């Protein structure tokens, strides 16, 4: 039997398609289509009768400490399938690196083990082909865990060549547009989305253990509400009515609190017809949760614990690195008012200046903020302070920080403070200079809520496209009585960006929105 000795570094790079480098993709595809035609003639083009018994990563982990002699003494028969990422043909012995959904493992192939006909066929296979093998687990002379193949099959022919292994998808937009290729050739991309799934699973478990019930509320709304944002519109043909893709589930979730479900949450998509940036995607994922008989202080403690646990479950630690800077989620999160944050990062501003509307408008102009925009026409000091905060302090909030005491005029659904006029029991959580969460003690006074909705309508009529509509049914629900409650929304995509050290929201959404291809 041929002794399995791995090729050394001098061997030619087999990661590239086994054709001349100068050949363009069209010629490669023509050759591969011819190979597929031959397979069709043989009646074996796309078989579906192979069932794997093992996964690569499980074998690598379980037998990491097993030496060559131990594997020979207790031979393990395995069946593995995956995509061929490397191929080295060396006369009477060949190697292939095959990657399945868990990881990768090496196949060792000889004509003695698989038969000359199969071996000759294997030599014609290409990088990217989906292959399968049965065989015995062993370790090569150089120590690599491998499968000595006794049966080898081609399950699916790859017609398009994979990108060069050393460069992958160099075009960032192409990574997003052809995510399927990115996932094939970029292990870090796959790790990102595995971490995303783990984080979401952790959140669901955390909520269940806190006695929250997961619910589903409508995606199509007759009236958009729950956030200040511009909605997508559509038309329901059967009902002949305009509908809106939801911008937030908040008002429906609070209807459920009225109905007696005291702790509810939903993880789902929201849609906002706004710009695209490294922080914004028109379609994004959030968790929103509501708990009766709690307030914004309880929410801050709960949200802090939730995020910390999500990091531990997804990454194994609460200490992470984001864009080269360490971030310790195990430490207590900071809490600052809007004015405290401004003065921390822009200490030149005095209390008197921050209480002066005229001064704030003048100062905002220096930052290029047009104070004549509809949302600023009748803005009070609180709104202007918030705008200045966004220009001076927001991007500086690297460590987890709750900004509290938001003005009523920008918080139409939040409960007013009993202690300080003009502000609400609301917070926003910032980490790495980005908003991660928004929560508050809920406004459950139907008359107060109706009055605030009317002010929002006035703002909309004045030209503010993001102002809220008047939702009469929600007011009706509140009139039946809603218990005191707290509610919070957390941006899942931004949270995952932080956990996976991803600079753009597109890096953590499998298929982000892009301009149409020309």
Curated annotation (Swiss-Prot):
This is Lysine--tRNA ligase. One of its GO terms (molecular function) is lysine-tRNA ligase activity. Its EC number is 6.1.1.6. PROSITE patterns: AA_TRNA_LIGASE_II. Belongs to the class-II aminoacyl-tRNA synthetase family. Residues 1-28 are annotated as: Disordered. Its main location: cytoplasm. Binds 3 Mg(2+) ions per subunit. GO terms for biological process: lysyl-tRNA aminoacylation. GO terms for cellular component: cytosol. InterPro entries: Aa-tRNA-synt_II, aa-tRNA-synth_II, aa-tRNA-synth_II/BPL/LPL, Lys-tRNA-ligase_II, Lys-tRNA-ligase_II_N, Lys-tRNA-synth_II_C, NA-bd_OB-fold, NA-bd_OB_tRNA. Mg(2+) 1 binds at residues 428, 435. Mg(2+) 2 binds at residue 435. It is found in: Cytoplasm. The lineage of its organism: Bacteria, Pseudomonadati, Pseudomonadota, Betaproteobacteria, Burkholderiales. It comes from Paraburkholderia phytofirmans (strain DSM 17436 / LMG 22146 / PsJN) (Burkholderia phytofirmans). It catalyses: tRNA(Lys) + L-lysine + ATP = L-lysyl-tRNA(Lys) + AMP + diphosphate. It comes from the Bacteria. Keywords: Aminoacyl-tRNA synthetase, ATP-binding, Cytoplasm, Ligase, Magnesium, Metal-binding, Nucleotide-binding, Protein biosynthesis. NCBIfam families: lysS_bact (TIGR00499), PRK00484.1 (NF001756). Homodimer. Its cofactor is Mg(2+).
